[in-house]
Curated annotation (Swiss-Prot):
Top enzyme class: transferase
Cross-referenced Gene3D superfamilies: Aspartate Aminotransferase, domain 1, Type I PLP-dependent aspartate aminotransferase-like (Major domain)
E.C. designation(s): 2.3.1.47
Keyword hit for GTP-binding: no
Catalytic activity: 6-carboxyhexanoyl-[ACP] + L-alanine + H(+) = (8S)-8-amino-7-oxononanoate + holo-[ACP] + CO2
Entry protein name: 8-amino-7-oxononanoate synthase
Cofactor(s), names only, from the UniProt record: pyridoxal 5'-phosphate
Transferase recorded as keyword: yes
Superkingdom per UniProt: Bacteria
Length: 381
């Protein structure tokens, strides 16, 4: 008998790697130093709070009091007074009846969508929904309808044509790839008429829209009995973690039903303490919200983006992924770090630079951004 040919069960990865390289879709990691040496137009630290001394002090104080880790799931040993205090404070800030913390925004989206849908339900999702919402749809066991971007009529048609008793519509408030706002009032009206729950991911709306309270608050939907919000603590609040905010019945249900809550270690106390302190800064310094949008306007003007930014995100579509990578690399070589989004994050043919404004940018930094972006984009021909 011939000896078996030794082939690694991971040999197929070589072919996948070659395909990614050929398509210009290979990704790599580039560690950042503790003290920034480049102008940051790529991070989600919209309000500049990740380095705020009060936020750092809040994290350190929680670390010293509660220890490094939560030590278990929230249902075992991972719950503290700090967790529950911050849940109440965050819910109060955005106008919700209650809140529930998760270990990340990704986990919060999985917990909310899967826990509030399930087999025998319909889930209607925007085509530009974040990967966490896409995965939540896949795990929900519900029938899923994906509608064109920000298309209220398509959502209406999906709800009107359903046989399922329960229906859930999910959307981001501010879409992470293009910075566009969801038509929340119109979506809510459609949901109300067709007895559907509206789940809104406020990851990029919290701290930026509604005076900081988010687009749900701005749309007049805060506290609505048929609206549930999810958010992250890692963007405007400069920390880490996630939350689901909405009616008290939703919180009670997810404690019993959300697997990403039940079977996951609780959020580290330091992250909670930092996020709580960041919320305090946001309340005390509302000027940061207006500064984000002003600075986004400057970046959009430099990049000749036609639409006035409605969020911290400025999207500069370049089309070809290799062109987008080259532009991002040129910016970095000139001392400016920008985001570079390629498929599958965005649709084919829409690779782009994704710039994010921060409240803490000063005039000198904006001038550097103006010079570098102008030169790089002009060099693309």
């Amino acid at each position: 008998m011939k000896a078996p040919i030794e082939v690694s069960p991971l040999a197929w990865l070589d072919a996948v790697e070659q395909q990614r390289r050929a398509a210009g879709l290979r990704r790599s990691l580039r560690p950042r130093p503790p003290v920034a040496t480049e102008l940051d137009l790529a991070s989600n630290d919209y309000l500049g709070l990740s380095q705020h001394p009060d936020v750092i002090d809040g994290g350190v104080a929680a670390l010293r009091l509660w220890g490094a880790g939560a030590t278990g799931s929230r249902l075992v040993t991972g719950d503290t007074e700090l967790h529950q205090q911050f849940e109440s404070e965050l819910a109060d800030y955005v106008g919700a009846a209650s809140g529930l913390l998760f270990s990340s925004g990704y986990a919060a989206n999985l917990g909310a969508v899967v826990g509030l849908s399930g087999r025998g339900a319909l889930v209607v999702s925007d085509a530009y929904s974040h990967a966490s919402l896409v995965d939540a749809c896949r795990l929900s066991r519900a029938r899923v309808v994906v509608t064109p971007h920000r298309d209220v009529d398509a959502v209406l048609a999906a709800l009107a044509d359903r046989d399922e008793e329960r229906a859930v519509v999910i959307t981001e408030s501010v879409f992470s790839t293009d910075g566009a706002l969801a038509p929340l009032r119109e979506l809510h009206e459609v949901c109300r008429r067709h007895r559907a729950l509206l789940i809104v991911d406020e990851a990029h709306g919290l701290g930026v829209r509604g005076g900081g309270r988010g687009l749900v608050f701005e749309a007049g939907l805060a506290g609505a009995p048929d609206v549930v919000m999810t958010t992250t603590l890692s963007k405007a609040l400069g920390s880490q973690g996630g939350a689901v905010l909405g009616p008290a019945a939703v919180r009670a249900h997810l404690i019993d039903a959300a697997r990403t809550f039940i079977f996951d270690t609780g959020l580290a106390p330091a992250a909670v303490g930092a996020a709580r302190a960041a919320l305090g800064v946001l309340r005390a310094e509302p000027w940061r919200v207006g500064a984000v949008l002003r600075h986004a306007g400057v970046l959009a003007e430099v990049c000749r983006v036609r639409e006035v930014p409605q969020s911290a995100v400025v999207s500069v579509i370049l089309g070809d992924p290799d062109v987008a990578v080259a532009a991002a690399t040129a910016c970095l070589d000139a001392g400016v770090r920008v985001g570079c989004f390629r498929p599958p994050t965005v649709p084919a043919g829409t690779s782009r630079l994704r710039l994010t404004a921060r409240a803490s940018l000063d005039d000198a930094e904006l001038e550097v951004a103006r010079r570098v972006l102008t030169d790089v984009l002009a060099g693309l021909g």
